[in-house]
From Swiss-Prot:
GO cellular component: anaphase-promoting complex
Protein name: Anaphase-promoting complex subunit CDC26
Lineage: Eukaryota, Metazoa, Chordata, Craniata, Vertebrata
Keywords from the UniProt entry: Cell cycle, Cell division, Coiled coil, Mitosis, Nucleus, Phosphoprotein, Ubl conjugation pathway
Function statement: Component of the anaphase promoting complex/cyclosome (APC/C), a cell cycle-regulated E3 ubiquitin ligase that controls progression through mitosis and the G1 phase of the cell cycle. The APC/C complex acts by mediating ubiquitination and subsequent degradation of target proteins: it mainly mediates the formation of 'Lys-11'-linked polyubiquitin chains and, to a lower extent, the formation of 'Lys-48'- and 'Lys-63'-linked polyubiquitin chains. The APC/C complex catalyzes assembly of branched 'Lys-11'-/'Lys-48'-linked branched ubiquitin chains on target proteins.
Signal sequence residues: none
Biased composition, class Polar residues, residue ranges: 71-85
UniProt source species: Rattus norvegicus
Pathway: Protein modification; protein ubiquitination
Coiled-coil annotated spans: 7-38
InterPro entries listed in its UniProt record: APC_suCDC26 (IPR018860)
PANTHER family reported in the protein's UniProt record: ANAPHASE-PROMOTING COMPLEX SUBUNIT CDC26
Modified residues (Phosphoserine): 42
Subcellular location field: Nucleus
């Protein structure tokens, strides 16, 4: 394997300005999106997100990610299928 000297990266003023502009733009979009969502959740759903009830919080997370939990039954057919013993 050939050894080579590390590549030098230079941070220029233009790069910093571009980064700041992009960051401000993203923050403005995020704030605008939060404002729109805040107005749209007047049915009390926004308050449910702040509640301390762990079940409702868990349910909100499950709904958001699309997870639908299945109840597990503790019988032999669910564990081993339809095998004959």
């Amino acid at each position: 394997m050939l050894r080579r000297k590390p590549t030098r990266l230079e941070l220029k003023l233009d790069d910093i300005e571009e980064f700041e502009n992009i960051r401000k733009d993203l923050e403005a979009r995020k704030k605008q999106k939060e404002d729109v969502e805040g107005v749209g959740t007047s049915d009390g759903e926004g308050a449910a997100g702040l509640s301390s009830d762990p079940k409702s919080r868990e349910q909100m997370i499950n709904d958001r990610i699309g997870y639908k939990p299945q109840l597990k039954t503790n019988n032999r057919t669910s564990q081993f299928g339809n095998f004959e013993f």
